[in-house]
Amino acid sequence: QRQMCIRDSMYSIMWLFMRKILFKIYLLFFFVGIAQPILSQSPYYYYKQLGIKEGLSQSKVQCVLNDHRGYLWIGTESGLNCYDRDHLKQYLHRPGDERTLPSNNITFIAEDSLCNLWVATMNGICLYDRGSDSFRTLSNNGKPIYVASYLLVEGGILLGGSGAIYKYVYATNKLEPLYYAQDPVYYNPFWQMIRYDEENILLNSRWHGIYSFNMKTYEVKKIESFTENNYTSIYLDSYKRLWVSVYGNGLYCYQGDQLIKHFTASNSPLTYDVIHDIMERDNQLWVATDGGGINIISLDDFSFTNIQQKQDDVHSFPANTIYRLYLDPANNMWAGSIRRGLIGIKNVYACSYQNVPFGNLYGLSNQTINSFFQDSDGIVWVGTDGGGINRFDPVSGTFKHYPATKYEKVVSIVEY
């Protein structure tokens, strides 16, 4: 049985001063040394939150775009927001003013290859005029066009509407209808459009199945093998595997026509069975859930890690209900939450721990550290100046405080 040998001594003021300097240097190199194996299992993240307190028009974020000028556009259920890294500016619908948004409920934001900024709302789609800081709503036969999805293609941008697909052609600056459903049964919004191969595009109508659209023939066909009635998200990864989430039934993975994986909260580490969005980053699949934070799946071995809000940990992820994921050009992930605004997620290579109430798992019992020691099992033992001994588990990232040493000054720890 291992015991810890603790030696409490008095030092001169000069030695204390020198020791603190030496300890800070040692602390830096120590954590650089142990950080690499920890990072390979569970990276450190820095979170930046933009919510109502920062000026966001509403807390449910439905879409995000980082444009070519570096501005971050944020669409909510109640207005469009533009963030210039210093300030948030709101854009709202004003009745009777055709130069404003047609609706405050923003469904997507897109920037095409000509740097046109598109904003889709529940009452139509519009183009943003940067010169006049205003919007122009597009129409078809004199009526606003409702679209729910987009896809950038050669020579223009595809727009998926209710039983309809349009193409905005750069050469003519006109909107051309490519497909109209003949049967009213198929007047369903296409909520997602993803390219499957050179000719075919997959369309997710959510409650009415998944369809394929042929870019050469303009034919739309329902894929009969998808028989569920609530597809919340579809995603084609870099290995050409199709990931499909079904409301309340987890995540499916298909290789061609074959189902190769089905992850649920009961048969895997998936933290929640309701999934809102899927995004790939650095050979990992990020999965946004409705109550379990973000699950991150390795595309090599299908292993899981997750980012979640933890009770009593003020530095943990700020929300567990995530509606939208967006990967910006700098490879930073943004998470649009349902109640906590927009959360920026950035990889960092170090983290800091501060003093917390005694017994809290996510910090030190005293912020002044006198000594520490890593034992043969990889556990880090920390001696504090008046808070006793702290035990840190690098794998879980949690601390344990020892009441028997609560007010002690611990200046040396060894193993025997």
Give the residues covered by each predicted segment.
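Carboxylate-rich, polar loop motifs that coordinate divalent cations or form catalytic acidic clusters
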Residues: R7-Y416
